[in-house]
């Protein structure tokens, strides 16, 4: 019996990356990836003069298999909401949509990854415009350079060459203090810290430097709540009680 194969034109990448609703949503997806990799922190550095966004974590990095998974559209090996434990730290999985590399493409055309795992350093980069011009991207090969390195080197660094429009939009969003603080408060966990730095403007935000939620707008605060997904319990507090 004759068979046919599914093919996907490169314009699909452009369309999917544009459907990511906002630059803040895209950054949140990248923050989730660092959290799920058990990094103690993530640093987002925005360099307007260079049109570069750098996202750095100290997580467990990516193996060859995990790099392959990164480019599997809408497919994730993670189970959202499930507890995972690594080196005595337990976290609840945040990412599951398979949006890792599409989120990076929200900001620009060229993205470079550098990741360390088990004494190996892997470097690879992708140019979105090269993919978009392909008639069929299902068989596109992405070169990955892997070298031995010290096992003390860990984590992943993503370098994005941002286009002017997306950089301008991102800076406009983060110019509002409340929005910048909301970004670094995307995940509240004592074992994880989110750093945001905007070069040229000497702007720096960090989860560790935020006020506690219960201390925000105390005079106007009606109540606040705490929820435990483990106990499946909601606690309401008024005036600290």
In which residue ranges do the predicted regions lie?
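ATP-binding catalytic core of ATPases
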Residues: 137-203
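Short polybasic amphipathic segments
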Residues: 110-113, 125, 191-201, 223
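Generic hydrophobic, helix-prone segments enriched in Leu/Val/Ile
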Residues: 16, 170-171, 187, 222-225, ...
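Generic alpha-helical secondary structure signal
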Residues: 65-68, 174-177, 211
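GHKL (Bergerat-fold) ATPase N-terminal catalytic module, capturing the glycine-rich phosphate-binding loop
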Residues: 1-162, 167
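GHKL/Bergerat-fold ATPase module in large chromosome/replication-associated machines
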Residues: 195-241
């Amino acid at each position: 019996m004759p068979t046919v194969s599914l093919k996907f034109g490169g314009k699909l990448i452009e369309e999917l990356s544009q459907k990511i609703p906002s630059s803040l949503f895209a950054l949140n997806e990248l923050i989730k990836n660092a959290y799920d990799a058990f990094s103690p922190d993530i640093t987002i550095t925005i360099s307007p003069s260079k049109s570069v966004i750098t996202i750095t974590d100290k997580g467990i990095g990516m193996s060859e298999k995990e790099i392959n998974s990164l480019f599997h559209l809408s497919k994730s090996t993670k189970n959202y909401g499930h507890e995972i434990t690594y080196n005595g730290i337990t976290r609840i999985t945040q990412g599951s949509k398979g949006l890792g590399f599409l989120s990076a493409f929200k900001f620009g055309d060229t993205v470079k990854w550098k990741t360390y795992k088990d004494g190996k350093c892997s470097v690879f980069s992708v140019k979105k415009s090269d993919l978009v011009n392909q008639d069929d991207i299902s068989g596109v090969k992405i070169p990955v350079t892997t070298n031995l390195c010290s096992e003390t080197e860990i984590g992943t660094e993503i370098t994005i060459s941002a286009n002017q429009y997306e950089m301008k939009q991102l800076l406009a969003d983060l110019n509002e203090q409340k929005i910048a603080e909301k970004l670094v408060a995307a995940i509240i966990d004592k074992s994880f810290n989110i750093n945001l730095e905007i070069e040229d403007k000497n702007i720096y935000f960090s989860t560790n430097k935020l006020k506690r939620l219960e201390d925000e707008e105390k005079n106007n605060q009606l109540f606040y709540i705490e929820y435990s997904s483990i106990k499946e319990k909601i606690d309401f507090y008024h005036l600290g009680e």
